Protein backbone atom coordinates (compact mmCIF):
# COMPACT_ATOMS: atom_id res chain seq x y z
CA UNK A 1 0.00 0.00 0.00
CA UNK A 2 1.36 3.44 -0.85
CA UNK A 3 0.20 5.10 2.37
CA UNK A 4 1.59 2.84 5.08
CA UNK A 5 3.01 -0.53 6.08
CA UNK A 6 1.50 -2.61 8.89
CA UNK A 7 3.44 -5.10 11.03
CA UNK A 8 1.41 -7.42 13.27
CA UNK A 9 2.36 -9.66 16.19
CA UNK A 10 -0.31 -11.95 17.64
CA UNK A 11 -0.52 -12.03 21.43
CA UNK A 12 -2.32 -14.32 23.87
CA UNK A 13 -6.10 -14.39 23.74
CA UNK A 14 -7.64 -11.75 25.97
CA UNK A 15 -4.71 -9.36 25.57
CA UNK A 16 -5.84 -5.90 24.47
CA UNK A 17 -4.66 -4.79 21.05
CA UNK A 18 -1.99 -2.10 21.10
CA UNK A 19 -1.03 0.12 18.17
CA UNK A 20 2.18 2.08 17.59
CA UNK A 21 2.91 4.60 14.84
CA UNK A 22 6.24 5.36 13.19
CA UNK A 23 7.42 7.85 10.59
CA UNK A 24 11.04 7.74 9.45
CA UNK A 25 13.21 10.83 9.13
CA UNK A 26 13.19 10.60 5.35
CA UNK A 27 9.53 11.73 5.40
CA UNK A 28 10.52 15.19 6.56
CA UNK A 29 11.14 17.24 9.65
CA UNK A 30 9.46 16.57 12.99
CA UNK A 31 6.38 18.71 12.24
CA UNK A 32 5.69 16.72 9.06
CA UNK A 33 6.30 13.35 10.72
CA UNK A 34 4.06 14.24 13.66
CA UNK A 35 1.28 15.40 11.34
CA UNK A 36 1.28 12.15 9.35
CA UNK A 37 1.27 10.12 12.60
CA UNK A 38 -1.71 12.15 13.88
CA UNK A 39 -3.60 11.46 10.65
CA UNK A 40 -2.82 7.72 10.84
CA UNK A 41 -3.80 7.65 14.52
CA UNK A 42 -7.18 9.22 13.66
CA UNK A 43 -7.75 6.72 10.83
CA UNK A 44 -7.13 3.84 13.25
CA UNK A 45 -9.32 5.47 15.92
CA UNK A 46 -12.26 5.47 13.50
CA UNK A 47 -11.72 1.76 12.80
CA UNK A 48 -11.05 0.79 16.42
CA UNK A 49 -14.51 -0.65 17.28
CA UNK A 50 -14.03 -3.26 14.51
CA UNK A 51 -10.37 -4.15 15.23
CA UNK A 52 -9.77 -7.62 16.71
CA UNK A 53 -8.21 -7.93 20.15
CA UNK A 54 -4.99 -9.77 20.97
CA UNK A 55 -2.49 -8.10 18.61
CA UNK A 56 0.41 -5.69 18.68
CA UNK A 57 0.28 -3.52 15.56
CA UNK A 58 2.86 -1.08 14.19
CA UNK A 59 1.76 1.31 11.44
CA UNK A 60 4.68 2.82 9.50
CA UNK A 61 3.94 5.90 7.40
CA UNK A 62 5.13 6.11 3.82
CA UNK A 63 5.77 9.14 1.61
CA UNK A 64 2.39 9.01 -0.17
CA UNK A 65 0.55 9.47 3.15
CA UNK A 66 1.82 13.06 3.40
CA UNK A 67 -0.32 14.47 0.58
CA UNK A 68 -3.17 11.97 0.53
CA UNK A 69 -6.64 13.34 1.34
CA UNK A 70 -7.84 12.01 4.71
CA UNK A 71 -10.80 9.94 3.40
CA UNK A 72 -8.44 8.12 1.03
CA UNK A 73 -5.87 7.60 3.82
CA UNK A 74 -8.56 6.17 6.10
CA UNK A 75 -9.66 3.79 3.33
CA UNK A 76 -6.06 2.65 2.71
CA UNK A 77 -5.55 1.95 6.42
CA UNK A 78 -8.80 -0.02 6.53
CA UNK A 79 -7.68 -2.07 3.50
CA UNK A 80 -4.35 -2.80 5.20
CA UNK A 81 -6.06 -3.93 8.41
CA UNK A 82 -8.50 -6.13 6.48
CA UNK A 83 -5.67 -7.73 4.48
CA UNK A 84 -3.78 -8.39 7.73
CA UNK A 85 -6.87 -10.10 9.21
CA UNK A 86 -7.28 -7.51 11.95
CA UNK A 87 -10.91 -6.58 11.30
CA UNK A 88 -13.87 -8.34 12.91
CA UNK A 89 -16.68 -9.45 10.66
CA UNK A 90 -19.59 -7.03 10.59
CA UNK A 91 -22.99 -8.25 11.61
Question: What function would you assign to each model-found segment?
Answer:
Residues 1-91:
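Positively charged, solvent-exposed patches that mediate nucleic-acid binding
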